[in-house]
């Protein structure tokens, strides 16, 4: 068997540059055709401090693997200090043994009695009609192709919250993970993600203790679907999560990649299939690194990448006596769609939501307050401060001011007809004078029964210029509805055209715009702007402008002025 050695590169650094150096090498991209999937860098920060960065490709190791890898490193260092070869304990199994065992466990999917077939069928049912994409509160639209650039915001829950989570978990026969999953799902639902919240979660996949000390990729990803419908209490939501998760854990052997092949969801280069939010609870054993002559401390590493839109990565801490000491971690987010400030606020919202629901688990999740006082004030007052100073001028005057500014600009386009502001204004002035001559003015109504057209805009403006209020009537209304509206509103006249098809009651006073006599009178009328001296009363913002009648679905139509 040909042995391969991992590349180890020695570099100089200093305290100002070390964080950037670590981040840079952590994002190393392996060429798996020519490189082994493990690489290391040793940075000399100063005479007394060095930083070792080991990067393992996921094909060769998972998060759990870092423990045995660190222990093997400590054994090797101690041996080399003594000038001897490392005396590693032989492993009971190799990764190849695991792959053969898994293949044997799943069996043939074509065999309906096999474990693989039954688990695939479970996931077909469990994930039926799952949302293709979770509508999260993005800061910008998702790109067509994801860049996978990411960042992390720290997340920490104090001892009080940790105790509350543990207590509720024990009370409901659930795990800490399940309580946190319910909290994340409740938050996302409150932020507009809907009532069906799929969350991806890794499982260690080491179902035999013989695998505990083996470096390799055993992790599988489960899609945990959280039902937040019906406004449940948080306690009820935890119970729902518990039932869903226990079912899913019983079918955790089918690889996620195989599920994607079988379920064949709508694919996109811009997002992850089946879920876009992940929740990981780190419970791998932590190894204390002991190396002769060295003080060793494990530090955080980051790749600057994000596989999902959001990934909540958490871990519990305990005191030496086993007492809860807090839950900490971070929210990894895709910078394609989120700003850091949004995720910082989200971390605060999750903390406040947990504090609220732990204090009263029977409280519906919809009633848990998640906003800070300043945020609540912004929502209730700042964004609702819609007061604006309005001009004292009425619509006809405002329109005439626009005519003065852009007389030849296009004002109306309809069915191939284009009219400028000047044309609309002059024709409306003529019709307004005709209406005033027939008694139109403030506190009077003029009904308009015309199809949608450029002419309709002129008519409505003319009624307003006269000082009267218009009553719109759809020519397609039933005759009895039209009769009722006219009887209730009592307009001085109905403006219409000959081909409108409207059925008006006998004796209704009407103005037919396309009647030759009307056309002649309009042509002989002045087109300049009207003055209050010509009107029966002054225009003002306190006189009626129009009357809209309700549908009448619950009785008779009612006019709203």
Model-based region annotation:
Residues 115-116:
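C-terminal membrane module of polytopic membrane proteins
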Residues 23-31, 36-45, 55-59, 74-79, ...:
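Adenylate-forming
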Residues 1-91, 138, 163, 167, ...:
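Carrier-protein-dependent adenylate-forming modules in NRPS/ANL systems
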Residues 366-378:
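Short, highly charged C-terminal tails/helix-capping segments
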Residues 377-380, 441:
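Internal, well-ordered interaction modules that form the hydrophobic cores of assembly/scaffold domains
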